[in-house]
From Swiss-Prot:
Role description: This protein is one of the early assembly proteins of the 50S ribosomal subunit, although it is not seen to bind rRNA by itself. It is important during the early stages of 50S assembly.
UniProt KW Ribosomal protein keyword: yes
CC annotations in GO: cytosolic large ribosomal subunit
Name assigned to this protein: Large ribosomal subunit protein uL13
Subunit structure: Part of the 50S ribosomal subunit.
Biological classification of the source: Bacteria, Bacillati, Actinomycetota, Actinomycetes, Mycobacteriales
Bilayer-spanning residue ranges: none
GO molecular function: mRNA binding; structural constituent of ribosome
Length: 147
């Protein structure tokens, strides 16, 4: 008997919603990346986009552990000479919390065409509302919350 290999048409994609309130950012990112890759399914294969859609709400209430709010910087470059910009994690969390959560999750996905396809199934919202109620997302509970 040969090993079962899933085909692209055999995979079904369900929807999950994760509430990021008081959840440590790294632990949230690991769980979301595993859902996006499909590693929670018994039919996981690294060459198939078998992951699910993930909707994250309340990104503005995510917990950052340690002294990272003031002590850790986030960098980006404009592409011009002298164009390196830096902000602390606290400043980024105040301005665009959805981008901070999205960058943490996308950084845990493969850096290939397949990884970009997986990251397109990630939807992050700063507040408690999202426009994906028609897809009937299933709540996904993360057991460990910040103290």
């Amino acid at each position: 008997m040969s090993t079962y290999t899933p085909k692209a048409g055999d995979v079904t994609h369900s929807w999950h919603v994760i509430d990021a309130t008081d959840v440590v950012l790294g632990r949230l990112a690991v769980q979301a990346a595993n859902l996006l890759r499909g590693k929670h399914k018994p039919t996981y294969a690294p060459h198939i986009d078998g992951g699910d859609f993930v909707v994250i709400i309340n990104a503005e209430k995510v917990a950052i552990s340690g002294n990272k709010l003031q002590g850790k910087n986030v960098y980006h470059h404009s592409g011009f000479p002298g164009g390196l910009k830096s902000r602390t994690v606290g400043e980024v969390l105040d301005r665009t919390p959805d981008r901070l959560v999205e960058k943490a999750i996308v950084g845990m996905l493969p850096k290939t065409k397949l990884g970009r396809a997986m990251s397109s199934k990630l939807k992050v919202y700063a507040g408690p509302n999202h426009p994906h109620t028609a897809q009937q997302p299933v709540p996904f509970e993360i057991k460990q919350v910040a103290q």
